[in-house]
Amino acid sequence: VAALSPSLIVLSLGTNESFSTSLTRDELYKQIDTVVSSLRKDCPQAQILLTTPAECARRRVRRVNKKRRVYYTPNARVKLVREMIRSYAVEHRLACWDWYEIAGGEGSSSQWRKAGFMAYDRTHCTETGYRVQGEMLYRALMKAYQEYVDRVAQ
């Protein structure tokens, strides 16, 4: 990463971590801190933007009349991971883009799936969904930049 001399590093994490039932808050905090510290050391000129994971769902299976039925339930740990990332960002004075909230919060993975933006696994976006996410992040960055320019110009 250092060879690229980035001015901005977007660090998206939390989705996979939210599926771990053994990962503690302290362990997650240490993992985030290890990555951020390494990036700060290797790329001191870069600003770091953390993003929270969107809501996702866990796959469940039940038997109904001897047939297996698959259904999905919201992954409740996403909220915990989201809060941990947001807290870390505040404590370390990092920007944080709250993808969980922006994507629609609780219940949004079903809506994204219906719109064709969330993959069948209810965890990952489709190609179109990732394009939408990228466009939303781009707009948020450009809006924040314009607000900064306007403040500096005053």
Language-model-detected regions and their locations in the chain:
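Short amphipathic alpha-helices and their capping/turn segments at secondary-structure boundaries
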Residues: V1-S5, T34-D42
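Oxyanion-hole/transition-state-stabilizing segment in secreted/luminal serine hydrolases
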Residues: V1-Y29, E55-C56
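Structural recognition of the beta-strand scaffold that forms the well-ordered cores
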Residues: S7-S12, Q47-T52, A95-W99
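Extended hydrophobic-aromatic, low-complexity segments
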Residues: S20-T21, Q47-T51, R59-R62, G107-S108
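Short, glycine/acidic-rich beta->alpha junctions
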Residues: E27-Q31, R77-L80
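Generic structural signal for well-ordered alpha-helices
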Residues: I32-S37, R82, R86
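Secondary-structure transition/capping motifs at alpha-helix termini
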Residues: L39-P44, A144-E147
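Catalytic His-Asp segment of secreted/periplasmic serine-dependent ester chemistry enzymes
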Residues: C56-Q154
